[in-house]
């Protein structure tokens, strides 16, 4: 039986309809561009220019290099995430109709190109990450003259404050007024990264002004050598009273007063890499977070007069750190570094951790004693002040230099100066801990003298006779012996 090859009308219609659908898809389907790629194209970084040349209220310019925006607020309004706002020769100007802070809600870079940035607003608040670089700040408003990271990343590269204007304080948290955060989108991981040799700023606070901060803060000063940099606090602060009607006053307002009630809930990490600051204040023990301070230097570093309530201090980089004051804390030494406590009257630390196999040093004054309430861990070398060539300075005989609450896990090394070659550092159990003291005088040490006088200091002789003769010349010398060399 033969098959009927003739199509039925309904089959023909179905096939024509299928062909039409396929044809339509071929015509309308476009190449698919990944969403991230589309976003990258749409947000390609641009440079927007601003230069203040035409008056406080003149909104002019188009943001090009040849026709920059006159006012900074117009340049910022035209910017998007990832863009750079570039300040040209006459500087930037941000006007103010009120004392509210200026809100940065776009992740931009403000490049001063070595020019000034004049601001009349009551500070800056970040709702996202922002970078300022190569700028001289001119903050005129005496009310909350600060930059608030608000839990975000704030980068300051070669940023300084101009003379005659406000010192700008830096906060990891935000600004609160009547209990309200003036920033709309607070973060919880503030980063304050400051670099630049000529940096001069006010104080740095890990927390907020007039309120608490729920998060952690990292503060990094890298190769900052400005002489006027302020103090670093691991808490928030209370805003000082400012007479807002006294706009033209040239008097610098009082800095915000660090206040323990304005807490930081997370840890505060402070790192000073070849940088200077006046003082570092940690948080009190009843705060949830801890304060970690790292000194990274390859040279003798005495830039910080005092450290208060810092729970953990790390010294690394191979240099020596000599604080004038230091609360009891855990000291960690890395990379053949040293901590010099000779400036302190009664030094005390919680513990010392020497993180390397050798090379880390503890330095004390000749008559000092260090109280370590816990213990020493790792290989550590002890020496007194003014040591040279891997040897200690002059030490006292029979003097207790270390008092530990718990026995150290390894011996503390000690290499005496050449004049005290037989001296040793001996450990002795004491209750649950131990003491380390130098050995007693043995009677074989070199004689120590004082008030030495040469009675006939003038010697008359021909130089050639002295050079070519085996004749001896004697000098009459008097001195006072004060015992064996223990000084």
Where are the language model's segments positioned?
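Extracellular beta-strand-rich solenoid/capping regions of secreted or surface-exposed proteins
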Residues: 94-109, 116-156, 168, 172, ...
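Bacterial N-terminal signal peptides
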Residues: 18-28
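Conserved small/polar residues in nucleotide/adenosyl-binding loops
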Residues: 485-487
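Sec-dependent signal peptide cleavage junction
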Residues: 26-44
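Acidic/polar low-complexity surface segments
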Residues: 137, 144, 165-184, 205-214, ...
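All-beta strand scaffolds that present successive hydrophobic residues in beta-strands
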Residues: 110-112, 130-134, 153-162, 187-196, ...
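Acidic Gly/Asp/Thr-rich repetitive segments characteristic of extracellular carbohydrate-active
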Residues: 49-88
């Amino acid at each position: 039986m033969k098959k009927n090859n003739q199509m039925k009308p309904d089959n023909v219609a179905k096939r024509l309809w299928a062909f039409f659908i396929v044809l339509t898809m071929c015509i309308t389907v476009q190449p698919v561009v990944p969403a991230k790629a589309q976003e990258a194209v749409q947000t390609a970084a641009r440079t927007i220019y601003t230069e203040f040349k035409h008056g406080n209220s003149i909104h002019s310019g188009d943001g090009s290099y040849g026709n920059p925006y006159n006012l900074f607020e117009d340049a910022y309004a035209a910017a998007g995430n990832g863009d750079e706002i570039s300040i040209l020769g006459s500087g930037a100007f941000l006007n103010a109709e009120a004392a509210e802070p200026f809100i940065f809600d776009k992740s931009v870079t403000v490049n001063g190109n070595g020019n000034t940035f004049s601001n009349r607003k009551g500070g800056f608040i970040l709702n996202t990450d922002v970078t300022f670089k190569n700028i001289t700040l001119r903050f005129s408003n005496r009310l909350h003259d600060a930059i608030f990271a608000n839990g975000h990343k704030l980068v300051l590269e070669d940023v300084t404050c101009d003379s005659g204007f406000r010192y700008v304080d830096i906060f990891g948290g935000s600004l609160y007024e009547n209990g309200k955060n003036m920033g709309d989108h607070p973060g919880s991981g503030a980063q304050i990264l400051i670099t630049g040799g000529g940096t001069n700023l006010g104080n740095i606070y890990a927390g907020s002004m007039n309120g608490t901060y729920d998060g952690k803060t990292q503060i990094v000063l890298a190769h900052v050598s400005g002489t006027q940099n302020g103090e670093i606090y691991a808490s928030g602060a209370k805003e000082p009273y400012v007479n807002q009607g006294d706009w033209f006053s040239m008097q610098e307002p009082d800095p915000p007063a660090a206040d323990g009630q304005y807490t930081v809930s997370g840890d505060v990490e402070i790192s000073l890499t070849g940088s200077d600051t006046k003082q570092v204040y940690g948080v009190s023990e009843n705060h949830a977070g801890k304060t970690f301070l790292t000194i990274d230097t390859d040279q003798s570093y005495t830039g910080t007069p005092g450290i208060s309530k810092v729970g953990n201090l790390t010294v690394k980089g191979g240099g020596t750190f000599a604080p004038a004051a230091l609360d009891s804390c855990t000291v960690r030494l890395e990379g053949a570094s040293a901590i010099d406590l000779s400036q302190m009257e009664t030094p005390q630390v919680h513990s010392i951790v020497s993180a390397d196999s050798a090379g880390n040093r503890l330095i004390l004054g000749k008559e000092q004693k260090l109280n370590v309430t816990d213990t020493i861990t790792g290989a550590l070398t002890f020496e007194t002040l003014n040591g040279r060539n891997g040897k200690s300075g002059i030490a006292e005989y029979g003097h207790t230099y270390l008092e530990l609450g718990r026995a150290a896990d390894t011996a503390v090394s000690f290499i005496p100066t050449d004049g005290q070659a037989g001296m040793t550092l001996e450990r002795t159990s004491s209750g649950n801990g131990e003491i380390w003291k130098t050995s007693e005088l043995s009677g074989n040490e070199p004689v120590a003298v004082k008030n030495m006088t040469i009675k006939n200091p003038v010697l008359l002789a021909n130089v050639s006779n002295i050079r070519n003769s085996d004749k001896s010349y004697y000098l009459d010398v008097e001195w006072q012996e004060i015992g064996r060399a223990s000084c």
